[in-house]
Each structure stands twice: as C-alpha cells, then as structure tokens.
Amino acid sequence: MNNKVGIVHSLKDGQKYMDIWPMRKELNPLFPEQRVIKATRFAIKVMPAVAAISVLTQMVFANTQAMPQAIVVALFAMSLPLQGIWWLGHRANTQLPPALASWYRELYMKIVETGFALEPIKSKPRYKELAQVLNRAFRQLDDTALERWF
C-alpha cells in the first residue's frame, strides 16, 4: 500500500483510529496514542471556544489593531485538534516495526487459539491492525492470557 495518503484520508483514518485504540493503562508506557487521543479530544471540546473568545474579546473592546493577531490565535487554536487527528491518521497507516509486528502476530494467534474470529492476519501490519487486535484481546481474553504481555 502506498504510505503517502491525502490529508482528508489521514483525518478520516485518525478519527477511526481514535475510536478503535483501546484506552488501557497497561498501554501507556508503550505507546503515546492514549495521551494524544486525550489531548485531541480535549482540544476538540475547548479550542473552538478559545478561538471564538480570542476574536470576540477584540471585537467587544473595539481593538481593531489587535484583530489580526486575534485571528491568527483563533486559526492556531482551531488547527490543534486537526493536528492531533492528522497525527493519529498518519500513525494508523504506519507499518509496525519488526518487534511490534511479531508481538501483533503472537497476540493474533492467541486470540484465534481461544476460538474468536478475526479478519485475516496481515503480512505487513500497521498500527491500526495492532489497535484492532489489542482491542479484541482486552475485550475477549482473560487476565491470565494477557499476563505474558502486560
């Protein structure tokens, strides 16, 4: 697969990746995804208000000289959630390093051994496939099966 994808595709993948990544404390030391997802969700909620306040305060005080700076601040505030979603989309389409790919295969085989159906294993897995397998593992495997990895 071509790793160079458009910005719109990356944003869509980022939103999907944000939904499928398991938000588990065991994964915090290993992956930055949980921190990025939390920051991005916070930015989605807060940054539109920051953008509006930065422009509206200049309008209320009739400070036309500071309006260009307020607009730049508003644009920057509005870009922060997009940057987080773009990063997640880019990360979702990145191939796993060899160590993580073998970990993905082990976890995949463990899930299949316990009798759960998964989509076919990927020869060159990406982070989004790892997220799907991790999500399934945390939902369907018991704690004793997960002890080896966490």
UniProtKB/Swiss-Prot annotation:
Q: What are the record's GO terms for cellular component? A: plasma membrane
Q: One matching Pfam family, short form?
A: DUF412
Topology class, membrane: Multi-pass membrane protein
Q: Which UniProt keywords apply?
A: Cell inner membrane, Cell membrane, Membrane, Transmembrane, Transmembrane helix
Cellular localization per UniProt: Cell inner membrane
Going by the entry's taxonomy, the superkingdom of the source organism is recorded as: Bacteria
Q: Where are the transmembrane segments?
A: 42-62, 70-90
Tell me which InterPro entries the record gives: UPF0208 (IPR007334)
Family membership: Belongs to the UPF0208 family.
According to UniProt, the name of this protein is UPF0208 membrane protein VC_1099
Species the sequence originates in = Vibrio cholerae serotype O1 (strain ATCC 39315 / El Tor Inaba N16961)
User: What is the phylogenetic placement of the source species in the record?
Assistant: Bacteria, Pseudomonadati, Pseudomonadota, Gammaproteobacteria, Vibrionales
